[in-house]
C-alpha cells in the first residue's frame, strides 16, 4: 500500500506525523510524495487560525482530485474541533480526534474500506530526516487562554512517564539520529500526570548514549525555572536555543487574554538565561519569540508597547509573528473591540521588518566565532546546510561524508 503525508501547523504535528510514517513503514507500507497517486492520504491538520483550516480543506480536495478512489485520513486539531464538517467532504474516509490518534497505524493496517466514521489516542516519539528527530513528551494544555482553541482540540495536559520517553530516545539513537527536539503543546508542564518534573526528564535524556544534541521546541516563560537554566548551563547536551511564547508585550493584553506572566517576569527569565549561558567571545543564546498581532483591544499604543519591548528590552534572534485569528468558541471571539484586518497586516509587516533587523544583528555578532554544526542530508543546487548549537543556519558545498556529522567551524 502507498501512503502520502501532509502536515500543517506546529512541530508537535510534525512529530506525530513522523511517528505514523515510521509505524506504517515498519508494517511494509510505501511512503510516496504528496503529489503522487497513493492508496491513502493522511493529513495532519491545524486549527490555530481560519487560514490553517482553509488550507486543510484544500489539501483534502486536492488529494481527492489526484486519486478519487483513495482513502483520505484526517487528524490533528481541526479534526478534533470539526469532525462532522470534515466527514462531509468528498473522499474523507476516517477522522481521528485528539484521543484517537494511537489507533491510526493499526486501523490503516487492518481495516477494510467502510463508511466514514469517527473512531479514539496516546503519545509518541518521532523523527525527521537522518540527522534530527522530534520526540513528543507532552500533550494538551490547561491554560485556556482567551484566544486559543488548543485545549479544546488537544485536551488537558498529560504526559507519559520518563522511563517511556527515555526508551523512545534510545530507539531514535539506534537509528543514528544525533539531534532530538523535545515537543509538546505545553512542554514545560511535563510531569502533571506522572508525578515527575521536567528537569528530571531533561536529566534522564541527557544520559542517553548516541544523542549529541537536544533542543526544547517551546516552553512557557513562567515554567523556565532557575534550576532548569542552571542545569542546562552547567554543560549538557541541551543547546543555547529557546523558543518562548510572549504573545504580547502589553501587560494589559497579557492579563486580559489570561497569560500566566507579565512582561517583567518574561524579561527576568530572558535576563537569567543570558547571565547563565553567555560569556564574552562565546556564542550567544538564540531566542525565538512568538507574538500575536491584533489581539482584540490592541490599540496602536499597546502594539507600540510590544514593538518597543522586543526591540529595546528583549532583542530576540527571531520573532514568529502571527496575526490574531478569531476562533469560534473562544472568549476573545465574542469581544467587541476586534482589530481590523488591514491594521493587523500593517502591524505584522512592522514586526517582520524588526525581526529581519534583529536576526541580521544576531548573526553578524557571531562572525569569527567558533561553533559546531550538524550537517543535514538534504541538498539543493549542490549545497548542504546545517545548524549551529545556537540555531544559526550555515551552508557549504555538498559532501556526503559530512552528512550527520558534527563539525567545528568559524562563522
Show where each model-derived region lies.
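Conserved SAM/AdoMet-binding glycine-rich loop
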Residues: 72-73, 81-82, 174-301
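Glycine-enriched alpha-helix->loop->beta-strand junction motifs that scaffold or abut catalytic
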Residues: 91, 233-240, 313-317
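Proteins enriched for Cys/Gly/acidic motifs involved in redox and nucleic-acid/cofactor modification
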Residues: 1-189, 203, 227, 242, ...
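Conserved, mostly hydrophobic/aromatic
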Residues: 145, 182, 216, 244, ...
Amino acid at each position: 500500500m502507498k501512503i502520502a503525508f501532509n502536515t500543517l501547523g506546529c512541530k508537535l504535528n510534525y512529530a506525530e506525523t513522523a511517528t505514523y510514517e515510521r509505524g506504517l513503514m515498519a508494517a511494509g507500507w510505501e511512503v510516496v510524495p504528496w503529489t503522487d497517486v497513493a492508496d491513502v492520504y493522511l493529513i495532519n491538520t491545524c486549527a490555530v487560525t481560519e487560514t490553517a483550516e482553509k488550507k486543510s480543506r484544500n489539501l483534502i480536495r486536492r488529494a481527492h482530485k489526484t486519486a478519487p478512489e483513495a482513502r483520505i485520513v484526517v487528524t490533528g486539531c481541526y479534526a478534533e474541533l470539526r469532525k462532522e464538517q470534515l466527514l462531509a467532504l468528498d473522499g474523507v474516509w476516517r477522522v481521528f480526534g485528539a484521543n484517537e490518534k494511537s489507533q491510526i497505524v493499526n486501523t490503516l493496517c487492518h481495516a477494510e474500506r467502510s463508511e466514514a466514521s469517527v473512531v479514539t489516542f496516546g503519545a509518541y516519539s518521532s523523527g525527521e530526516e537522518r540527522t534530527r528527530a522530534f520526540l513528543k513528551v507532552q500533550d494538551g494544555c490547561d491554560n485556556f487562554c482567551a484566544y486559543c482553541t488548543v485545549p479544546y482540540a488537544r485536551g488537558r495536559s498529560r504526559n507519559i512517564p520518563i522511563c517511556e520517553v527515555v526508551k523512545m530516545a534510545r530507539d531514535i539513537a539506534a537509528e543514528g539520529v544525533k539531534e532530538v527536539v523535545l515537543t509538546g503543546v505545553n512542554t514545560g508542564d511535563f510531569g502533571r500526570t506522572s508525578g515527575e518534573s521536567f528537569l528530571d526528564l531533561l536529566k534522564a535524556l541527557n544520559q542517553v548514549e548516541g544523542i549529541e544534541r537536544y533542543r526544547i521546541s517551546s516552553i512557557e516563560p513562567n515554567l523556565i525555572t532557575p534550576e532548569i537554566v542552571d542545569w542546562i548551563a552547567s554543560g549538557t547536551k541541551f543547546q543555547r536555543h529557546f523558543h518562548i511564547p510572549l504573545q504580547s508585550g502589553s501587560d494589559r493584553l497579557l492579563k486580559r487574554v489570561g497569560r500566566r506572566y507579565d512582561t517583567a517576569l518574561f524579561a527576568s527569565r530572558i535576563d537569567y538565561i543570558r547571565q547563565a549561558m553567555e560569556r564574552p567571545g562565546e556564542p550567544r543564546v538564540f531566542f525565538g519569540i512568538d507574538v500575536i498581532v491584533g489581539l482584540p483591544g490592541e490599540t496602536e499604543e499597546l502594539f507600540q508597547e510590544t514593538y518597543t519591548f522586543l526591540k529595546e528590552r528583549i532583542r530576540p534572534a527571531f520573532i514568529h509573528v502571527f496575526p490574531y485569528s478569531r476562533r469560534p468558541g473562544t472568549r476573545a471571539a465574542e469581544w467587541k473591540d476586534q482589530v481590523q484586518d488591514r491594521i493587523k497586516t500593517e502591524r505584522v509587516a512592522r514586526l517582520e521588518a524588526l525581526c529581519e533587523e534583529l536576526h541580521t544583528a544576531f548573526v553578524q555578532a557571531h562572525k569569527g566565532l567558533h561553533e559546531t554544526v550538524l550537517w543535514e542530508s538534504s541538498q539543493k543546487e549542490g549545497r548542504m546546510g546545517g545548524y549551529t548549537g545556537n540555531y544559526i543556519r550555515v551552508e557549504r558545498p555538498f559532501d556526503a561524508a559530512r552528512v550527520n556529522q558534527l563539525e567545528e567551524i568559524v562563522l
